[in-house]
């Protein structure tokens, strides 16, 4: 249906100064009689005093008169708000949001009116100040060392807020922890860096670069590279809990890098805080002078100015080596869908700018730099970065494998003579199989792993096929936490339902023909006749515990084939236990048992120390005379019987009964060491026989026995998914 033409549409007329003169409406057509009639309205507000004009759509069709009136009302309100914004002194509570919404005059835009009417001048100018260059003598690069839950993220938040790097209205808890998993677990997984501008009491401006570090032992290599990019570190210790195991591990890494360490006693506001006791602990255990340790409460903001002053006065500036060939240390990287891999680095020597051709010295790949900038903590592009500065670069890099943590960046035109020391390839230590519950999700699982690998060069995976589980992947991880994080991200971010096999470690198998092979999958272990010996990785584990739990923890270590090395009392009430332990004994529930037996008070840290020969055997689980590969495990010879007995008994409870008897066996080679049987369901074939000749009954029973025999030879026992999941959980506990 055609829309009637309106010779004289409703409109808005304006004078030169923007005021509304009149409105005209057509009287030739009654809009109430013609609902489909459209009124055309055009509105324009001309801003006075040099402000830019705001123009609404020149033509806008409205389907009734009320809508036209509504538009006219909005235009009038817009005009009224603009006039009110000119009188900012009379309306101090409009705030930054109102000023941005109604586009206040340019001379007012740089003032951020807070809720209490006071101007906060740490808005637009602060970003410009952070980009301003300072002498290299005024640069400080530092990190924060702390155990889990000792307040590292809270302290970082306060430093960002106190220096004005992040405005109060933008602040949130754990600002540098972007992943949901990091917030939920209270740990740092992906590194972050933040550039802060700090002005001391004399008015001198400093550039402070905070390089965050992950706190878990799985990422100890990343921690070492982050510390290598700094000249100092804040040692944060909970004033109520004292020194923990992970604190010691990271402090030793910092001392190896010759960093200036500033002790900070956090959480002094807690009722159980005892700063004097913790000072003595630090001096006795680590050997640091804590007479000038800073008392701090990051939550309440106590001691933050003292920490900033200590960073400026005690941590030395970087060396002025800007004239030398470029050498930059990569301490983190991540994959961006649009720019490729974005590299976080510290310039150790030389300069780098946009357009330079750079080479990653260990991977031997070359790229042209598309963008360089600083992290404040958002990415802010700059023209150039020189020695001592921390920033990022993007160069259309397609894989994080080309820009690994610890690699050295140099320019193609003027290459450095040698790379920075300390580079290592991240080597997976723990392996497990990942299988989708729904076989149709195999392709989705592969795509999800490929996406995760773009951000995580340490993650390795390869296809794996199982007769019982179908198609899946054998994945390698840095440690148990790394494995848990990847599994949880696959399930949460990609919506996958997964079955995970029992975790295993990498074994070295010496074969009879003189070759040495590495095996991470128990089902791929060579036959016993081809094996000469098997080596397994060992770790040095240090346990810090109150003296009341020394006995239970020593029992736990001995149960896991631990070799006692040392015990010492670090204080009157706390002791340190050192053991050499097989890594395979830790990948189960060792940490859970540690916390359970110590009531949560003990902490641990470990480091891999090499391989040792052990008496290991492959334990196969056979169901109805068929080996089930995902249930195979490598165990010590002394534990094989108990593990086999536990697995067969559990499977007997979980597998449903069939019309034929199902044998469940735990085998070492061809030798059965444990066995259980699931009895067959009985079908009463004699129910219709009410008497008569016994030969009829014998004939029916014989026919039933032949059918069961044929069914057993041809039948297939499907282990249900919940049984698999339960038995795999049991494997993680008993292995």
UniProtKB/Swiss-Prot annotation:
It is an enzyme of class 3 (hydrolase). Keywords: Chloroplast, GTP-binding, Hydrolase, Nucleotide-binding, Plastid, Protein biosynthesis, Transit peptide. GO terms for biological process: positive regulation of translation; translation. InterPro entries: EF-4, EFG_III/V, EFG_V-like, EFTu-like_2, G_TR_CS, GUFP, LepA_C_sf, LepA_CTD. Residues 106-115 have a biased composition (Basic and acidic residues). It comes from the Eukaryota. SMART domains: EFG_C. One of its GO terms (cellular component) is chloroplast. Residues 11-38 have a biased composition (Polar residues). Residues 1-38, 106-126 are annotated as: Disordered. It is found in: Plastid, Chloroplast. GTP binds at residues 146-153, 212-216, 266-269. Residues 1-47 form a transit peptide. Belongs to the TRAFAC class translation factor GTPase superfamily. Classic translation factor GTPase family. LepA subfamily. PANTHER family: TRANSLATION FACTOR GUF1 HOMOLOG, CHLOROPLASTIC (PTHR43512:SF4), TRANSLATION FACTOR GUF1-RELATED (PTHR43512). Promotes chloroplast protein synthesis. May act as a fidelity factor of the translation reaction, by catalyzing a one-codon backward translocation of tRNAs on improperly translocated ribosomes. This is Translation factor GUF1 homolog, chloroplastic. It comes from Physcomitrium patens (Spreading-leaved earth moss).
């Amino acid at each position: 249906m055609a829309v009637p033409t309106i010779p004289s549409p409703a409109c808005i007329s304006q004078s030169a100064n923007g005021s509304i003169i009149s409105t005209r409406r057509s009287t030739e057509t009654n809009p109430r009689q013609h609902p489909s009639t459209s009124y055309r309205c055009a509105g324009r507000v001309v801003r006075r005093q040099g402000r830019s004009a705001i123009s609404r759509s020149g033509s806008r069709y409205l389907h009734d008169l009320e809508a036209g009136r509504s538009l006219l009302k909005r235009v009038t309100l817009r005009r009224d708000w603009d006039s009110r914004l000119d009188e900012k002194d009379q309306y101090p509570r409009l705030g930054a949001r109102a000023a941005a919404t109604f586009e206040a005059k340019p001379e007012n835009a740089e003032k951020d009116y807070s809720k209490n009417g006071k101007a906060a001048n740490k808005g637009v100018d602060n970003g410009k100040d952070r980009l301003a260059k300072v002498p290299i003598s005024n640069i400080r690069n530092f990190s924060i060392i702390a155990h889990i839950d000792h307040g590292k993220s809270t302290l970082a938040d306060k430093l960002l807020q106190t220096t004005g790097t992040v405005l109060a209205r933008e602040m949130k808890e754990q600002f540098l922890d972007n992943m949901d998993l990091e917030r939920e677990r209270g740990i740092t997984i992906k590194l972050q860096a933040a550039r802060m501008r700090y002005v001391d009491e004399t008015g001198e401006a400093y550039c402070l670069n905070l390089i965050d570090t992950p706190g878990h032992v799985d990422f100890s290599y990343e921690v070492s590279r982050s510390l290598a990019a700094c000249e100092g570190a804040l040692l944060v210790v909970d004033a109520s809990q004292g020194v923990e195991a992970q604190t010691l591990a990271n402090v030793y890494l910092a001392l190896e890098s010759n960093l200036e360490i500033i002790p900070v006693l956090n959480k002094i506001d807690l009722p159980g805080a005892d700063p004097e006791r913790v000072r003595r602990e630090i001096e006795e255990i680590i050997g640091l002078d804590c007479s000038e340790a800073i008392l701090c409460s990051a939550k309440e903001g106590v001691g933050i100015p003292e920490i900033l002053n200590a960073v400026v006065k005690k941590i030395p500036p970087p060396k002025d080596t800007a004239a030398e060939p470029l050498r930059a240390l990569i301490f983190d990287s991540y994959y961006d869908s649009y720019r490729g891999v974005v590299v976080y680095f510290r310039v150790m020597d030389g300069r780098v700018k946009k357009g330079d051709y750079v080479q990653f010295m260990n991977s031997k790949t070359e790229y042209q730099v598309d963008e360089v900038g600083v992290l404040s903590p958002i990415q802010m592009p700059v023209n150039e970065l020189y020695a001592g500065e921390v920033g990022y670069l993007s160069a259309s890099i397609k894989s994080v494998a080309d820009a690994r943590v610890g690699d050295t960046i140099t320019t193609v035109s003027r290459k450095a003579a040698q790379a920075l020391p300390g580079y290592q390839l991240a080597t997976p230590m723990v392996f497990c199989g990942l299988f989708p519950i729904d076989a149709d999700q195999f392709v989705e699982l592969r795509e999800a792993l490929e996406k995760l690998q773009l951000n995580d060069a340490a993650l390795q995976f390869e296809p794996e096929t199982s007769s019982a589980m179908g198609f899946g992947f054998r994945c390698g991880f840095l440690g148990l936490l790394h494995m848990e994080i990847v599994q949880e991200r696959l399930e949460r971010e990609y919506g996958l339902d997964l079955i995970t096999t029992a975790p295993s470690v990498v074994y070295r198998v010496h074969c009879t023909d003189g070759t040495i092979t590495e095996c991470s999958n128990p089902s791929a272990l060579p036959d016993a006749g081809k094996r000469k010996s098997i080596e397994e990785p060992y770790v040095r584990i240090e346990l810090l515990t109150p003296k009341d739990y020394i006995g239970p923890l020593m029992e736990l270590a001995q149960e896991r084939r631990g070799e006692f090395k040392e015990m010492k009392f670090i204080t009157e009430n706390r002791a340190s236990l050192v053991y050499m332990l097989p890594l395979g004994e830790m990948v189960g529930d060792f940490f859970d048992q540690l916390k359970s037996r110590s009531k949560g008070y003990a902490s641990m840290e470990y480091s891999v120390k090499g391989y040792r020969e052990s008496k290991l055997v492959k334990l196969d689980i056979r169901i109805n005379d068929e080996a089930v590969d995902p249930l195979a495990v490598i165990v010590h010879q002394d534990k094989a019987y108990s593990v086999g007995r536990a697995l067969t008994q559990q499977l007997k409870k979980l597998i449903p009964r069939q019309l034929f008897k199902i044998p469940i066996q735990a085998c070492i080679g061809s030798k059965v060491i444990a066995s259980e049987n699931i009895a067959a369901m009985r079908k009463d074939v004699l129910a219709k026989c009410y008497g008569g000749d016994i030969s009829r009954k014998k004939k029916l029973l014989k026919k039933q026995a032949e059918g069961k025999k044929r069914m057993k030879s041809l039948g297939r026992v499907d282990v249900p998914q919940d049984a698999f999941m339960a038995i795999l959980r049991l494997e993680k506990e008993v292995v």
